[in-house]
Amino acid sequence: MQQDDDFQNFVATLESFKDLKSGISGSRIKKLTTYALDHIDIESKIISLIIDYSRLCPDSHKLGSLYIIDSIGRAYLDETRSNSNSSSNKPGTCAHAINTLGEVIQELLSDAIAKSNQDHKEKIRMLLDIWDRSGLFQKSYLNAIRSKCFAMDISNNTANTASQQLSLDPKQRSKQILSNLKKSPPLNLNISLPTDLTSTDPAKQQAALFQVIAALQKHFKTLPSHTSVGTVAPPQAHTITEYGSRRERERERERYNSRRNRSRSPPAPFSQPSTGRKDRYPSVAQDQYSIGAPNTTFGTNNHHLYPDELNVSNNPHYRPKPVSYDSTLPPDHIKVYSRTLFIGGVPLNMKEWDLANVLKPFAEVQSVILNNSRKHAFVKVYSRHEAENVLQNFNKDGALPLRTRWGVGFGPRDCCDYQHGYSIIPMHRLTDADKKWSVSAQWGGTSGQPLVTGIVFEEPDIIVGEGVSSKAISQKMPTDSGRNGPRSGKPNKSGSISSISPVPYGNAPLASPPPQQYVQPMMQQPYGYAPNQPLPSQGPAAAAPPVPQQQFDPTAQLNSLMNMLNQQQQQQQQS
C-alpha cells in the first residue's frame, strides 16, 4: 500500500511540472531522481512516464523534461558503473532503463529543439556535450542530432557520395563499421629493438632510437588505410591535443572516480561536493546545467570540449588558417605560432568547463588537459589571435589565482621560445606524423600548402595514436632554466609577477634589414581581420634566434615509444 502511495506521489510530482511557468524545478527533479534510484525494480514504469511527459508537455517545458531525463539517466548510469551486479540489460535494472532512454532520445531531442527558443536550444546543445562526455548515450545518436539540428558536423567536401557515408540508423551503422573492420588487415608490430637501446653511450643509444622510429614509421606507411577498404569510411578520429601523460591522466581520473558521489549531477561551479542521497541533486535553478558546471567526466581520448567538430564555415568555431613566409629563418626551418596556453594556480575544485568559462570573454577554448594534483592545465584555443588576447587581457586585476603563459603544443620543446610563444623548427626534426598534421589539421597548419623553408603558420591539431610526434620524444624544458625556456610567473621577492608581454602575431617590430615577405595568392585572411583590410605581416618578432642545439632524453623518448607500441597493441586486440 505504501509503495502504491509513493508511486502516485511520483506521478503527481511529475504532473506538477506542467503548472510551473518554466517547467523546471531543482527540488522536484531531485525528488523524482531519489524515487527512481530507490525503486529500480519498477524502472520500466518510471522511464515510460518521463518519456511520455517529454512527448506531451508544452513547448516551453521541453527543456525541463530533458533535465529530468538527464538527472535520472545519469543517476542510473552512475549506479550501473558503481555496482557490477546492475550492469545486465534485464528489465528492472539501471542498464535497461538507460537503454530504453537511448532508443527514444533522438526523437525527444529533435522534438524539443524544433519547439524551443534560441536560449533553450543553446542549453540543449550543452546537454548534448554533457551526455557525450559522461557516456550516457551513444555518440552516434548525439552526433546525428548535432548534424541534423545544429549543423555542426557538416563538411564542405561535396566529393563524398551517399554510399560513402555511414548510416544514421544505429544498427545499420554498427554493421557497416564491423564489416569494414573485418576487411582490415590485422596490425603486425613485430619490430626488433636494437641492442644499443640499452647502451651507456648516448650517441649509440640515440642512433638506435632513431632506427626504431624509422622502422615504426616505415611500418605504419605500409599499413593499408582503413578508409580505403570498401565504400564505407569509418568515423573521423577525435583530434586530441597531446600535452600531458596519458597514464597520469588515467590515475587522476581513477582517484576522482573513487571519491565521487553516486549521482552524475554535480554541485554548482567551485562548490564542494555534497554527500548523501538526499543532497546530491542540486537545483537546476542554481545553474546546474550552465556550461561552466563541472558535471562531466572526460575520457582518456576526449580532451576536446566539442569532439568531432569540423572547421567549416557554418561552425561557430570556424577559424581561417593564416599562412605567411619569413625569409630571415635559417634554411630548412619553419616557424609555428603556438595556440597553447599554460594555466597555473588552478584550484582543486575547478574543472575543464570552469576554465573554459572564465576564459570565454577573451577566447573560445578548444581543448583542456587538466592536472588537478599539480594545479595546472594546458588549454588550447582556436586561434593565435585569441591566445594573445588571453595573455594580454585575462585576469589583469589579479582577482583569480590563475596565471597564464605560453605553452608548446607542437614540435620539439627545445625549439620553442616560451617568452614569445613560437617555435623555429628544423624540418629534419619533424616526424612524418608532424608533417602530415601540419598540412591536414582542422585548426592551424598550412591549409594544404607544402612545408617549405620559411613557412609560418599556427599550431596544428594533432591526432594521438597516428604516429610519433617530435614533441613527445623531446626533452622537457625546466622552468626558469634558460633565456627562452618557460618561466614560473609566480610573484618574485618584490611582489611583482615576472612575465613578458606576448609579441602580437603580425604586429611585431621587424629585424634589420626587414624580411622580405613572399605571400601567395591563396593565403587566407587571419581570424579577426576584415576582408577589406590589408593582410598584416606575420614575420618574425625579432631577429631569428640561433638554432637551438638538439637535446636528447633517451628515457623520455623510449617511454614515448613504448606507450605508442602499447596503444597499437591494444588497438590490435580490440579489433
From Swiss-Prot:
Compositionally biased region (Low complexity): 517-527, 549-575
GO biological process: antisense RNA transcript catabolic process; CUT catabolic process; mRNA 3'-end processing; nuclear mRNA surveillance; sno(s)RNA 3'-end processing; snRNA 3'-end processing; termination of RNA polymerase II transcription, exosome-dependent; tRNA 3'-end processing
Skewed-composition ranges (Basic and acidic residues): 244-257
Domain named CID: residues: 1-153
Localization per record: Nucleus
Compositional bias segments (type: Polar residues): 471-482, 491-501
A Pfam family of this chain: Nrd1-Seb1_dom2
Protein keywords: Nucleus, Phosphoprotein, RNA-binding
One GO cellular component term: nucleus
Superkingdom of origin organism: Eukaryota
Modification Phosphoserine, positions: 263, 265, 271
Domain RRM residue range list: 339-409
Coarse class of the protein's main subcellular location: nucleus
InterPro entries, per database record: CID_dom, ENTH_VHS, Nrd1/Seb1_RRM, Nrd1_Seb1_dom2, Nucleotide-bd_a/b_plait_sf, RBD_domain_sf, RRM_dom
Keyword Lyase in annotation: no
Region (Disordered): 225-282, 468-575
Gene Ontology MF terms in the entry: mRNA binding; protein domain specific binding; RNA binding; transcription regulatory region RNA binding
Additional comment: Present with 19600 molecules/cell in log phase SD medium.
Role description: Plays a role in sequence-specific regulation of nuclear pre-mRNA abundance.
Descriptive protein name: Protein NRD1
UniProt source species: Saccharomyces cerevisiae (strain ATCC 204508 / S288c) (Baker's yeast)
Gene encoding the protein: NRD1
